From Swiss-Prot:
Record GO cellular component, one term: cytoplasm
Native species: Mus musculus
Expressing tissues: Expressed in germ cells of the testis (at protein level). Also expressed in the lung and kidney.
UniProt protein name: Deleted in lung and esophageal cancer protein 1 homolog
Alphabetized InterPro entries for the sequence: DLEC1, Ig-like_fold
Superkingdom as given in the UniProt entry: Eukaryota
Mutant lacking the gene: phenotype: Male mice are infertile due to impaired spermatogenesis. Sperms are immotile and show an abnormal head shape and short flagellum, and are often accompanied by an abnormal manchette structure.
Amino acid sequence: MDSESKEEQQCTASSAVMSSLETQFLSVPHQLESASLSWSIRKSLHSSTVLMDDCHFGFPTRSLRAGFHALPPLPEPQTLRLRPASLRTQEISHLLARVFRNLYTAQVIGDDLSDSLIKARGSEDARHEEFLDQLQQARAIYKQRLDEAAMLERHIMQARARDIAETEHTTKQSRLQVVETPVKLPPVKTAFRWCLDSKLMRKHHLISTEDYYTDPVPFCPAPKDKSTLGCSKLTFSCEQRFLRKSELDREAEEHCRQLTECDDFEYTVDSLGSISKAKERTTDSVKKTSRPKNKKWMEHLQVPQRALDRRLLASMENRNHFLKNPRFFPPNTPHGGKSLIVPLSKPERRASLNAEPEWSCTDAPVFLAKPSVGFFTDYEIGPVYEMVIALQNTTSTSRFLRVLPPSSPYFALGLGMFPGKGGIVAPGMTCQYIVQFIPDCLGDFDDFILVETQSPHTLVIPLQARRPPPVLTLSPVLDCGHCLIGGVKITKFICKNVGFSVGKFCIMPQKSWPPPSFRAVATTGFVEQPPFGVMPSVFELAPGYAILLEVLFLPTGLGQAEETFIIVCDNCQIKEVVVVGTGQLVALDLIHISGGKNEPDPGELKDLTAQYFIRFEPENVQSTPKKQLIIRNAT
């Protein structure tokens, strides 16, 4: 039975292989039937024949179908890491990833997997628990190493920062000692050795400063003293040169001293001889010229050498008499050329013919601005206004110029448009600049533009923005009159704009000025500051138009009330308005009573709070007597 079952298994395996071969042959397109078999088909044929042979001899212990399904898929290779762009970097991870590939780049147990394994521990398997303990210890050691590396990196960075600060302080102190600061001083001694902890570096097997410093460390640092810098000390060759020069100077001084002594001796002998001869022959002494008293200049310089030195001095002096560049001098000056708009002043006739013309450097400008003042008017918030300013060269030489833009953010200067290349303006030609004005309110703005040339004088072009302000015909004091306490009185005032521009106005209490935001203060319709209220609080008036301002007076106390309101215009101008009102109580005067005033009889009952007493005469029943009272309002 066993042999029959084995034969049946071999037959089923061979039939399965043949069926797979048939499917592979059928899957080949019709156009490739005449060609040879593909490499995959031949490989499958070879593997199938080997499997059939193996199955024939009975080597496999599992079924063929189970063997095919048990093969695991090959893992995808890990991607290589990029090579660092810098050649000085010490990172070699890309080399390790290229050599070891999956062993280096593939993550066997990541952080997420290890965290989940440690959190879910509690298995009955002892080997699994031991593995988790070792994994937790490895993670703790790994975290400790990372913390130590971060601590070392932080310590090195702090030491480097302290070293840089100490170096800068030492360099600054050395610059104070040098009279003439050179372009770049030599570096000072570094203090990095004293800022780094050598024991900590050795503990973690790192290179410390003591490994490359051979001099012994002093027990305590030496006191700092003012010492001459190495850059200010003389070198060996310079010292030798100065020593040789000092010796030559000493020899020259000794030689001059000897010549002076000889000259003095000869002068005394000659003077005595000349005095004796003068007494004998007075007429001959007048004709003969006396010898020079100081012969030192004759001993040092010969006549040919003296002439050569004079020619050398004359040639050196002639080098300074060159033609000056007229661009560096104002016009109508000795070296500045002529002005095209300001003529030279002629000398007076009475003066000599050699009189020089009067030069003036203040009346002759180099560039003339057209227009001379940048003026903007009738502007609004939002648009950008432009103006072209032309600068004309008024001299007889071509000149360069530099225009400095305005300093305020409301004016901007565009690029210059020159008549030629290179930014040079020929005589009589003009260059143009566009000035932009960007207002953020309707107020007044002032700024200026500076035009600099190679001459020392600077041209100032003012920039102004003016808008005719609106003018309101509103009295500075608004009197609401008298009102009873607890009542309401409305007073109307006419407000007219007699200016030349449209204005938007906002009324607010004085305590709210200046506001953080006009949107928060400007209420629609009504603004209140007890006991007064003004409406409307926001309005707009065109030139020649008027509006009625209603002032509400609600007195709560007796006497005069006064409050101040601020009227703010959109051109940043304000106007203070004082609102005045008087609160009163009810006051009545009894002027006349028909029949006259009566007095109560003694003992007769009456109202003690009453001021007047009115008595009616006895009348019949159902009759109606009348008395007329005249009452006047005394408020």
